[in-house]
Amino acid sequence: MRYLARTLFALLLVCQPGWALSSEMTRSDKALWLNVGAGALALGWGTWSWDWGAAGPRFQDEGWFGRTTGEGGADKLGHAWSGYALSHLFAYSYERFGYGRSDAARYGAYSSLGVMTAIEIGDAFSDEYGFSYQDMLFNAAGAALGYVLWEYPEINRKIDFRAEYDPFPRGKRQLDVTTDYQRLKYLIAVKADGFEEVTNPLLRYLELHVGYYARNYESYSGPGSSDRRERNVFIGVGLNVTKLLSPYVDTGGVFNYVQVPYTSINLDRNLDRR
């Protein structure tokens, strides 16, 4: 549940500034209190729900994208996506506070990395987790990508970093969908609608997808058990759901971060097929 909790408190803190922070406060004060609130809530929630303080500080080498890692690397992309999405939530708030686009992009990345780092440090004092430098690298990579795409809207119009959750595959289900890697995919979407060179109105509804996912890690219990673990890469063509729905509803940009399942045709390659 820890990643779901992180996402919820991030949304609560970052989306509420318009009404929760007094209009009489300076933008610097609003930014300060937003970050103090995020840090305090992370500390309180982590101590209560994630057993921070139950053990002494320790590091944990989780590996990268190897087949024998805990999640085949899908969790690393989950960290990157969290850092990316959180940086944009913060940047959105900073613009509402009165910061210009460049400052909002920079401070959004800093705040995202700060929150994610605080959580990782808290994990170092947990019996279950531990500080992972691999996680930290992908936290930073996600925040950096968030900075680039917010700072440069001409790139943002062309590229999205998305997570896709498909509830239908078989296997053990988790209440926390953000760590249910049996049903998650991560992808980069290149949107035809962002390129002026694409003039055909129908082609502008299409996207190129490149992504990664892992499967069957939750059912593997160790040596001697059935081992169906697999890591997959894919390339595909998808529909721009935001553009499709824009004449009818304002999606608020949510589909720039979340990929709707079954709206693309993919060619998959299993990296572990013998």
Which residue ranges define each predicted feature?
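Hydrophobic alpha-helical membrane segments
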Residues: 21-274
